[in-house]
Amino acid sequence: INDIDNFFEMNNGRIFTLFDLGRNDLAIRSGLAKKLFKHRWGLVVAGSTIQYRKRVRLFDKVTIKTRLIAVDERWFYIEQSMWVKGQPTCSALLRTGITNIVTGKVLPTKQVLSALDYKDINMPPDDWVKAWSDADKIRPFPKANVHLAKDSAITE
């Protein structure tokens, strides 16, 4: 019941949860999941953006498509989309990484690709992916221990 909002449509939080499952499926099919357990690695989402175009209504059958679209020195860029009746409903771009679960540090993509025997992959980000990634680098992030104004709607 938490998947559906007041208008009998899938809520945006559930869409991201289903996209999590799509990335897990990609990890299993690519052989990455076995390497995660073997090397004590973890998956992390470092950034995401999503576009919504059509509603997903109660009882709609959805298809999720997940694909790796780019790799740089540190990040794997994944595009995910949800489809109903052959039409895209939403599309997300995610900047993801593989971490050492002991240290929490993001591993270089070359190290991960080498473990998967994909040593010669060359998938630089397209201009639109790079523009999003670059813009995200200059986006301000909240500072620790900074309290909101007293008239703010959100309080601690």
Predicted regions and their residues:
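Catalytic strand-loop segment that frames the active site of acyl-thioester-processing enzymes
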Residues: 1-25, 29, 130-156
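Charge-rich alpha-helical segments
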Residues: 29-32, 101
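Short, basic/aromatic beta-hairpin or loop at an interaction surface
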Residues: 34-43
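Low-complexity, acidic Ser/Thr/Pro/Gly-rich terminal tails and inter-domain linkers that flank the onset
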Residues: 44-45, 56
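Short structured motifs
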Residues: 46-52, 64
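HotDog/MaoC-like acyl-thioester-processing domains
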Residues: 56-61, 68-156
